[in-house]
Amino acid sequence: MFRIGQGFDVHEFAEGRPLIIGGITIPYEKGLLGHSDADVLLHTIADACLGAIAAGDIGKHFPDTDPAFKDADSAVLLQKVWEFVREQGYELGNLDCTIIAQKPKMAPHIESMRKRISELLETSIDNINVKATTTEKLGFTGREEGIASQAVVLLQKK
């Protein structure tokens, strides 16, 4: 049996925070605002995985009202989600992600993100695709106010 999940997340830029996307710290003058480390891509992937098994979303499992998750490492959160997915009897078919950002340029970091995500999801890098696009200076991402991401995951029963 196959299950498909879709994820979407948005975070606004904030001064004085590191920019962490896909488990990788990216040199930039701003980071993303959030209760955790605000890794927009890993949050999106977690939501896609949870959606595929009809288990809600990241906010249900790691609420931003819980001080235990303040400044949490999103890689650890994704690992917990993935452990839960595997306990339900699923493994990864493939994952396709899109980062939507005017700046900074993501291309130099894509392969590092793919590698890190493949480690977190215990799969071959060949099952992970990460790409980036801009909105041609339209909307909040085009005005460089934040970053969005989308992901689609295919899970298969072990």
Curated annotation (Swiss-Prot):
<comment type="similarity">
    <text>Belongs to the IspF family.</text>
</comment>
<dbReference type="GO" id="GO:0016114">
    <property type="term" value="P:terpenoid biosynthetic process"/>
</dbReference>
<feature type="binding site">
    <location>
        <position position="143"/>
    </location>
    <ligand>
        <name>4-CDP-2-C-methyl-D-erythritol 2-phosphate</name>
    </ligand>
</feature>
<comment type="pathway">
    <text>Isoprenoid biosynthesis; isopentenyl diphosphate biosynthesis via DXP pathway; isopentenyl diphosphate from 1-deoxy-D-xylulose 5-phosphate: step 4/6.</text>
</comment>
<keyword id="KW-0414">Isoprene biosynthesis</keyword>
<feature type="binding site">
    <location>
        <begin position="9"/>
        <end position="11"/>
    </location>
    <ligand>
        <name>4-CDP-2-C-methyl-D-erythritol 2-phosphate</name>
    </ligand>
</feature>
<dbReference type="InterPro" id="IPR020555">
    <property type="entry name" value="MECDP_synthase_CS"/>
</dbReference>
<feature type="binding site">
    <location>
        <begin position="57"/>
        <end position="59"/>
    </location>
    <ligand>
        <name>4-CDP-2-C-methyl-D-erythritol 2-phosphate</name>
    </ligand>
</feature>
<feature type="binding site">
    <location>
        <position position="140"/>
    </location>
    <ligand>
        <name>4-CDP-2-C-methyl-D-erythritol 2-phosphate</name>
    </ligand>
</feature>
<dbReference type="Pfam" id="PF02542">
    <property type="entry name" value="YgbB"/>
</dbReference>
<feature type="site" description="Transition state stabilizer">
    <location>
        <position position="35"/>
    </location>
</feature>
<feature type="binding site">
    <location>
        <begin position="133"/>
        <end position="136"/>
    </location>
    <ligand>
        <name>4-CDP-2-C-methyl-D-erythritol 2-phosphate</name>
    </ligand>
</feature>
<feature type="binding site">
    <location>
        <position position="11"/>
    </location>
    <ligand>
        <name>a divalent metal cation</name>
    </ligand>
</feature>
<dbReference type="GO" id="GO:0046872">
    <property type="term" value="F:metal ion binding"/>
</dbReference>
<feature type="binding site">
    <location>
        <begin position="101"/>
        <end position="107"/>
    </location>
    <ligand>
        <name>4-CDP-2-C-methyl-D-erythritol 2-phosphate</name>
    </ligand>
</feature>
<feature type="binding site">
    <location>
        <begin position="35"/>
        <end position="36"/>
    </location>
    <ligand>
        <name>4-CDP-2-C-methyl-D-erythritol 2-phosphate</name>
    </ligand>
</feature>
<feature type="site" description="Transition state stabilizer">
    <location>
        <position position="134"/>
    </location>
</feature>
<protein>
    <recommendedName>
        <fullName>2-C-methyl-D-erythritol 2,4-cyclodiphosphate synthase</fullName>
        <ecNumber>4.6.1.12</ecNumber>
    </recommendedName>
</protein>
<comment type="function">
    <text>Involved in the biosynthesis of isopentenyl diphosphate (IPP) and dimethylallyl diphosphate (DMAPP), two major building blocks of isoprenoid compounds. Catalyzes the conversion of 4-diphosphocytidyl-2-C-methyl-D-erythritol 2-phosphate (CDP-ME2P) to 2-C-methyl-D-erythritol 2,4-cyclodiphosphate (ME-CPP) with a corresponding release of cytidine 5-monophosphate (CMP).</text>
</comment>
<dbReference type="InterPro" id="IPR036571">
    <property type="entry name" value="MECDP_synthase_sf"/>
</dbReference>
<dbReference type="InterPro" id="IPR003526">
    <property type="entry name" value="MECDP_synthase"/>
</dbReference>
<feature type="binding site">
    <location>
        <position position="9"/>
    </location>
    <ligand>
        <name>a divalent metal cation</name>
    </ligand>
</feature>
<feature type="binding site">
    <location>
        <begin position="62"/>
        <end position="66"/>
    </location>
    <ligand>
        <name>4-CDP-2-C-methyl-D-erythritol 2-phosphate</name>
    </ligand>
</feature>
<feature type="binding site">
    <location>
        <position position="43"/>
    </location>
    <ligand>
        <name>a divalent metal cation</name>
    </ligand>
</feature>
<dbReference type="GO" id="GO:0019288">
    <property type="term" value="P:isopentenyl diphosphate biosynthetic process, methylerythritol 4-phosphate pathway"/>
</dbReference>
<keyword id="KW-0479">Metal-binding</keyword>
<comment type="subunit">
    <text>Homotrimer.</text>
</comment>
<dbReference type="GO" id="GO:0008685">
    <property type="term" value="F:2-C-methyl-D-erythritol 2,4-cyclodiphosphate synthase activity"/>
</dbReference>
<keyword id="KW-0456">Lyase</keyword>
